[in-house]
Amino acid sequence: MQHNRVDILGTPVSSLTMDELFNDWEVVIQQGQKAQVCITPVNSILAARATARVQEIYKNADYVLCDGVPVKWASEFLRDPIKERITGLDVLPRIFPFAVAGGFTIFLLGATPGVAETLKEVMEAKHPGVQIVGTFVPPFRVVFSKEENQQMIDAINAVKPDLLLVSLTAPKQDIWIAENLAKLDTHVAIGIGGAFEVAAGMINRAPVWMQTAGLEWFYRFLQEPKRMFKRYFVEAPVFIPLIIQQKFSKRSGRP
C-alpha cells in the first residue's frame, strides 16, 4: 500500500498512523497479498547506513516503522515529520484483537525457549477466539543452516498463518523475512523485536511518562544492561551528529 516515507540517514521510514497501518494490513490479507513490516529503532537505521544489504531491505520493505522517539525527533528536526511513532511494543498488543475481529490467524517465530508459548497462553486467555496456530523457536545462531531454515519455513507453511510475527532481533529478523518471504505461505510478516517478552508479562515496559519523554531506552538499559550497553552508549550517540550532517548537507545541496 502507498504511503509517505521520510529519509532518515538513507532509510525510508514510513509516515502513517497506527490506524492506517492496520487498515492496510487488513486489505493485504483480504486481497491475498504479501507485505514485509520492519520496525526500526536507531540501531537498525545505523546498521542500514553501515551495511548496503540491510539498507536495500529497508528500501524494498513495504513498511519501515518509526520505533523510537529519537527517530521521530530526527524527522521533525529535518522538517519532514513522521506522523506517528509506532513501536513493536505498541503494535504487538493490538495485533491480537485485530486478528480476532478479522478472523485472522497468527504464528509466533523466535525469542528464547518458552517465551512464544507463554505469550500464546497469555493472549489466548486475554483474547478469547484468538487463533495462534503455531510457535517455533529456532536455535540461537548468527546464521541458520539450510536444514534449520527449512524447518522454520515448513512449520509456518504447515498452518498458513495470515500474520507471521518474527522475534529474532533487528536487523537479523528483517534480513530473514526478506530472504524467505517469497517461500512463506503468509501475508503480513512483521519483525517485532523483543516485544514477545513484554507482551507475555515476562519483562515490564517503561512507565508511560518515560515513554513520552523519550526515556524508554534508559528503562530497558536498567533491565538488561549487558545486552543494551552497546546499543545505547556506543551506537546511539553517533545518530545525532549524523542527523545534523544530513540536514546541513541537504541545505547545501551536497549528497
Tell me what each language-model feature is:
Residues 70-75, 206, 210-255:
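A transmembrane-helix-recognition feature enriched in membrane-embedded lipid enzymes
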Residues 120, 174-183:
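Short Gly/Thr/Asp-enriched flexible loops that form oxyanion-binding sites at enzyme active sites
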Residues 41-45, 168-173, 195-196:
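Short glycine-rich anion-binding loops that position phosphate/pyrophosphate groups of nucleotides
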Residues 85-86, 93, 133, 183-195:
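Short, acidic/small-residue loops that bind anionic groups at enzyme active sites
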Residues 76-160:
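Conserved beta-alpha
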